[in-house]
Amino acid sequence: MFKVVICDDERIIRQGLKQMIPWKEYHFTTIYTATDGVEALSLIRQHQPELVITDIRMPRKNGVDLLDDIKDLDCQVIILSSYDDFEYMKAGIQHHVLDYLLKPVDHTQLEHILDILVQRLLERPHSTNDDAAYYTAFQPLLKIDYDDYYVNQILSQIKQHYHKKVTVLDLINPIVVSESYAMRTFKEHVGITIVDYLNRYRILKSLHLLDQHYKHYEIAEKVGFSEYKMFCYHFKKYLHMSPSDYNKLSK
């Protein structure tokens, strides 16, 4: 759904951010990494990410120069720095960056920022009908925490067992709550049924597998659909295109 470019000359920082942040929970499906501003600028121009996370002090092209280069592009920026330096903070303010984080990065703080960013991204106009279908299909999945205990438990069960051939009863049995209460409460808080959420989540997970060039029937099985034709039906229902059409658009 979303793309991010992580730019830092320290490998441990790049890989740490790439591997330790649960990007898919925030619907970032593609993560690019760069070792300096020159490499980052190339990736940004080529892939047009929604988010750029960049260090300030780097060889060849520093973070401030990178901000100058991308100031007219449609992306959000988070600045990283080992230095609590007012001049860098001022540069960030001048370029309207999303936030400024000191190293070592507090992952909880970064995830809070991502939560806010995702909501902003959803509010922007969609450039194509394909974009609109994508956002409409997966918007109900963006909120990851609710005020209701049972709803959160059902979401947890879905994320743990979506790849299995499960029923609503299978999902709520471990929670010890009546089926009617669980279904009613879930619909009130989330806005869609448990089955609808499960199928949308399965289709979202299938996109990552499509990018990895699995056979479509293999993907259907991996994300929990009992039949390949049901996978195709739900894919087209939510995204208004077939898996094959999606593959063509992704190339």
From Swiss-Prot:
Residues 3-118 form the Response regulatory domain. Phosphorylated by SE_0166. InterPro entries: CheY-like_superfamily, Homeodomain-like_sf, HptR, HTH_AraC, Sig_transdc_resp-reg_receiver. One of its GO terms (cellular component) is cytoplasm. GO terms for molecular function: DNA-binding transcription factor activity; sequence-specific DNA binding. One of its GO terms (biological process) is phosphorelay signal transduction system. It comes from the Bacteria. Keywords: Cytoplasm, DNA-binding, Phosphoprotein, Transcription, Transcription regulation, Two-component regulatory system. Residues 169-190, 216-239 bind DNA. The modification 4-aspartylphosphate is found at residue 55. Disulfide bonds: none annotated. Its main location: cytoplasm. Residues 152-249 form the HTH araC/xylS-type domain. It is found in: Cytoplasm. It holds the Pfam family Response_reg. Probable member of the two-component regulatory system SE_0166/SE_0165. This is Uncharacterized response regulatory protein SE_0165. The lineage of its organism: Bacteria, Bacillati, Bacillota, Bacilli, Bacillales.
